[in-house]
Amino acid sequence: MVTKSLELIFDFGSPNAYLCMKALPELLDRTGADLVITPCLLGGIFKATGNKAPMIQYADAPAKLAYENLEMRRFIERHGLAKFRINPHFPVNTLTIMRGAIVAADEGTLDDYVDAVNRAMWEEGLKMDDIEVIATFLSANGFDGPALLARTQEPEIKAKLVQNTEAAVARGVF
């Protein structure tokens, strides 16, 4: 029997990634597919592909930006995502928390890590590019914050995040 899977290539810095992750369980239940989460650096993808964040891309087209925001609000309403809030510190440099996702994957805790960090970013509005905030949050949510953060500095962890990002670009992600 062939197993169906859906790969989500994501960065915590994207509010759309959060929204997608919250809407995916219904699709996965309906299709029987398994979710494969692949952490990457959205900024690295943008740089490699010449793409830009919508707020920059559409800065000179206010009607387009307003429409993008309207569609986001519609999506939030359609999927009942009332806890979502734009992070007041947005955009957030996600390098450390994305490396943390690589560590969590290595330690078999990626799903819990993704749930927790998504909540911190897009529900609680924490400044998730501040090492102290990250360590405190992780420690309060079932992780060894200092140990996980120490591992984000390991060359293998750094290399895996770069590898994931480069592989995403090679596959056409923009």
Residue map of PLM features:
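Structural alpha/beta surface segment adjacent to cysteine/selenocysteine redox centers
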Residues: 19-121
